[in-house]
Design a protein with these regions (language model features):
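C-terminal helix-to-coil terminal segments
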Residues: 197-225
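Glycine-rich phosphate/diphosphate-binding loop of Rossmann-like nucleotide-binding domains
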Residues: 64-143
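Phosphate/diphosphate ligand-binding glycine-rich loop within oxidoreductases
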Residues: 1-63, 189-191
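Gly/Ala-rich phosphate-binding loop of Rossmann-like dinucleotide-binding domains
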Residues: 14, 90, 94, 196
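General beta-strand structural signal in soluble alpha/beta enzymes
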Residues: 21-24, 41-45, 76, 127, ...
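Rossmann-like adenosine-cofactor binding region
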Residues: 119-195, 200
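Short, acidic/turn-prone active-site loops that include or flank metal/cofactor-
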Residues: 45-50, 105-108, 206-211
Length: 225
């Protein structure tokens, strides 16, 4: 960019392409782009707001691994305040009558407006500081990294950066046989490498699922079936 406005950029790009895939650090930019674009816009993540394309591959992975999306017990662990993947997947799983467990320090716990949406939908949720207390109950353990780039105060990041880390011995024999571990990636220290060899670890398959899911999204956006 050479100083032009965001709106001008979108207008120009939409005249060159059949679809726009946008990732932007500011909340709401995908909607801003969609409002003025002459071609379909796919939101690949806007700030701390939403990440719907990730959610579609998450849903696909859950369906493939567990056989259905209905009434699953899902625990989100880590940065829930700024984690856009968590926000989007929570809203999606709401339609399948999931039960939610939100595991995080108070300073990065789930935003109140999303908790209110769950209450209005009549869905169960609970807040926790430690995932160990609910590990035996859940179908899905959804880990996230603590995102340094989301913190304005470095001291606040330092307080929570190592809040959660799972090791192989934390999982094996302590969870249900069918439980799966997901992560939007990249991981930092929140999942030990030793966990990779567990049958519960499905985050690399989850990432691989992103290729066909996103291909399908683009195909639908440009009118192909």
């Amino acid at each position: 960019m050479k100083g032009e406005s965001f709106e001008d950029t979108i207008r120009m790009v939409s005249s060159y392409s059949d679809v726009i895939v946008i990732r932007h650090p500011q909340d709401g930019t995908a909607q801003r782009a969609a409002n003025i674009s002459s071609v379909p816009v796919i939101n690949a993540g806007d700030g701390k707001n939403e990440h719907p394309s990730q959610t579609l591959l998450d849903l696909y992975t859950i369906q493939e691994e567990l056989g259905s999306l209905e009434e699953k017990k899902i625990a989100f662990v880590g940065d829930l305040k700024y984690g856009r993947t968590v926000h989007s997947l929570t809203r999606a799983m709401k339609h399948f009558r999931a039960k939610f467990y939100f595991v995080a320090p108070d300073s990065i716990q789930m935003p109140q407006y999303l908790l209110q949406e769950l209450e209005e939908a009549g869905l169960e949720y609970s807040l926790h500081r430690h995932y160990e207390e609910i590990l035996s109950e859940i179908d899905i353990l959804y880990m996230t990294r603590i995102q340094k780039e989301r913190f304005e105060d470095p001291k606040e990041f330092e307080k929570v950066e190592s809040a959660y880390r799972i090791e192989k011995e934390d999982i094996v024999g302590r969870c249900q046989e069918h439980m799966i571990i997901l992560h939007p990636l990249p991981r930092v220290d929140e999942i030990a490498v030793s966990v990779d060899e567990c049958k519960h670890a499905r985050y690399f398959q989850q990432a691989a699922n992103g290729v066909p899911v996103r291909e399908a999204m683009i195909a639908l956006a440009v009118g192909k079936k």
